[in-house]
Amino acid sequence: MWIGVISLFPEMFRAITDYGVTGRAVKNGLLSVQCWSPRDFTYDRHRTVDDRPYGGGPGMLMMVQPLREAIHAAKAAAGEGAKVIYLSPQGRKLDQQGVCELAMNQKMILVCGRYEGVDERVIKTEIDEEWSIGDYVLSGGELPAMTLIDSVSRFIPGVLGHHASAEEDSFVDGLLDCPHYTRPEVLEGMEVPPVLLSGNHAEIRRWRLKQSLGRTWLRRPELLESLALTDEQMVLLAEFQREHKP
């Protein structure tokens, strides 16, 4: 997967390219992240990238010319088929379904806003989609872009150590993840559930599904409303609910 990034702070993306799962993906040639700064497309001595908005008001906007030229440079490097995405609180809210959709793209260009945003005409002429990571305001689009990169990269074949890891993440099937345990077997009097030590893979699968359903019911019940549960899932959820009556 190739991802181009338009940002005034490209050095922030070392957190993606140098560390963790995404860093290994870059090192192994499974993920490529290339950055362009609008400052590199300025022609004045101060490398100005912001300007006052028409109509007045607080704050500044990103200048059109440097931003458009940076986007055009990224498009030229990407070739055909690269989707241009603007990270914006006004965009579609990113969820696991959205991550799965975005992961189908082999090329993406992520545009990170700063200041009070960008000229609406840039959005209309250069941007294919707008995405948001939540209903709150950040200082810029870099953190949302890194969130998007991290989440979609988990679906690149070979990125995760185990092929089932991404499939078992929270939200992949609309449910929260089940509890997980590692050594020691007993920690301050709290024991690992015996079923996980049994070696019975069918029972372990059943326990994990039951816990996943139950945790979703306890913590995010609204998620269950949009799911068509199987007969097995309905039985397991009912069992969990009986076991956890107030």
UniProtKB/Swiss-Prot annotation:
Subcellular location field: Cytoplasm
E.C. numbers: 2.1.1.228
Residues annotated to bind S-adenosyl-L-methionine: G113, I133, G134, D135, Y136, V137, L138
Top-rank taxon: Bacteria
Keywords: Cytoplasm, Methyltransferase, S-adenosyl-L-methionine, Transferase, tRNA processing
GO terms of molecular function: tRNA (guanine(37)-N1)-methyltransferase activity
Cited SUPFAM superfamilies: alpha/beta knot
GO biological process: tRNA N1-guanine methylation
A Gene Ontology term for the protein's cellular component: cytosol
Purpose: Specifically methylates guanosine-37 in various tRNAs.
PANTHER family xrefs: TRNA (GUANINE-N(1)-)-METHYLTRANSFERASE
Family recorded in the similarity comment: Belongs to the RNA methyltransferase TrmD family.
Subunit-level organization: Homodimer.
Name of the protein in its database record: tRNA (guanine-N(1)-)-methyltransferase
Lineage, top ranks: Bacteria, Pseudomonadati, Pseudomonadota, Gammaproteobacteria, Enterobacterales
